[in-house]
Amino acid sequence: MTIIRKKHPLIKIINHSFIDLPTPSNISSWWNFGSLLGLCLIIQILTGLFLAMHYTSDTATAFSSVAHICRDVNYGWLIRYMHANGASMFFICLFLHVGRGIYYGSYNMIETWNMGIILLFAVMATAFMGYVLPWGQMSFWGATVITNLLSAIPYIGTTLVEWIWGGFSVDKATLTRFFAFHFILPFIITALVLVHLLFLHETGSNNPTGLNSDADKIPFHPYYTIKDFLGVLILLMAFMILTLFFPDILGDPDNYTPANPLNTPPHIKPEWYFLFAYAILRSIPNKLGGVLALILSILILALMPFLHTSKQRTLTFRPITQTMYWILVADLLILTWVGGQPVEHPFIIIGQTASIAYFTIIVILMPMAGMIENNILDLD
């Protein structure tokens, strides 16, 4: 078996990636999320495939087809709720994975990090288009509001929006193309994941100390396969509790009402995992400014390698920057909460303050804290 594992042209690629991969001996459970994201992607592709067998991407029948899946298809309700809540689990793992990358300075592996940012954008685009497909009230109005943001682009904005819509409003053409894109994107994401792993295996994994671990590597299997398996069990446990006991807790009740272009819901808001970005978008009164802030809220991650001022890679031994990091986490939770609130006092000012704090912490305070720590430790 060893000979096949190491010699076979196809199997040896898997061997070098998941079995004999030299891995730092001290990586913690925070390094589990890569494999958990892979599991989430597989779950989403499989459940999505079975949903696509019964779904119809037509404005007249889309809502009914989803109801039909839940009522008449064998275990259709389970497949539908696994797919909907699988997206939430996906984003929880994504945010924790990115948070780990920021905390332990993994952004210094620039190619892997940039690939991860592209993946994040791709997953967000996929989730947004998936939310439109059930053709409920929030699907329709969410699609209308978010696509309309492109009209803020000077000169070509309006033309671009109508081109994406395939008409003068969100209608049948929009739904059909969103379904097509929603179907193809996960496979593109899978390809990008392989590139992400390729870049990662060029440099090897980071570790909690941020030090070079070449002298202390162990094989991925059995040590980290068993460790990842524990993470898988915990994720599946949480996932099934969410799906079977509280399937609608993260959804919007408005989406159980069929889409009606003549009736605007009182509060249009996206799914919970977009609320932090939505809060940043809403905090700027100018339309174009809001759109730019929205894009920058994610794109700012690409600046992280260039904003790294410390002589140490991770935050493990850097209490000042650690404090800034956890304030940033709290700030993101505040933004997520505010994004789901109506646009009125005091939520407007809270959102604006939290948005300013978000960019200030990343661009100014964390780099400054890094320099202060260098001075304290005489690392200059």
From Swiss-Prot:
A GO CC annotation given for this chain: respiratory chain complex III
Keywords, comma-separated and alphabetical: Electron transport, Heme, Iron, Membrane, Metal-binding, Mitochondrion, Mitochondrion inner membrane, Respiratory chain, Transmembrane, Transmembrane helix, Transport, Ubiquinone
Pfam family, one: Cytochrome_B
Disulfide links within the chain: none
Presence of the UniProt keyword Glycosyltransferase in the record: no
InterPro entries from the UniProt entry: Cyt_b/b6_C, Cyt_b/b6_C_sf, Cyt_b/b6_N, Cytb/b6-like_sf, Cytochrome_b, Cytochrome_b_C_euk/bac, Cytochrome_b_N_euk/bac, Di-haem_cyt_TM
Membrane topology recorded in Swiss-Prot or TrEMBL: Multi-pass membrane protein
Cofactors demanded by this protein: heme b
GO terms of molecular function: metal ion binding; ubiquinol-cytochrome-c reductase activity
Residues at which a ubiquinone binds: H201
TM segment ranges: 33-53, 77-98, 113-133, 178-198, 226-246, 288-308, 320-340, 347-367
Residue numbers binding heme b b562: H83, H182
Cofactor note: Binds 2 heme b groups non-covalently.
Predominant location: mitochondrion
Annotated binding of heme b b566, by residue: H97, H196
Gene3D superfamilies (UniProt xref): Cytochrome Bc1 Complex, Chain C
Subunit structure: The cytochrome bc1 complex contains 11 subunits: 3 respiratory subunits (MT-CYB, CYC1 and UQCRFS1), 2 core proteins (UQCRC1 and UQCRC2) and 6 low-molecular weight proteins (UQCRH/QCR6, UQCRB/QCR7, UQCRQ/QCR8, UQCR10/QCR9, UQCR11/QCR10 and a cleavage product of UQCRFS1). This cytochrome bc1 complex then forms a dimer.
Task of the protein: Component of the ubiquinol-cytochrome c reductase complex (complex III or cytochrome b-c1 complex) that is part of the mitochondrial respiratory chain. The b-c1 complex mediates electron transfer from ubiquinol to cytochrome c. Contributes to the generation of a proton gradient across the mitochondrial membrane that is then used for ATP synthesis.
PANTHER family: CYTOCHROME B
Anything else known: Heme 1 (or BL or b562) is low-potential and absorbs at about 562 nm, and heme 2 (or BH or b566) is high-potential and absorbs at about 566 nm.
Family note: Belongs to the cytochrome b family.
Name used for this protein in its record: Cytochrome b
Lineage of the species this protein comes from: Eukaryota, Metazoa, Chordata, Craniata, Vertebrata
Gene designation: MT-CYB
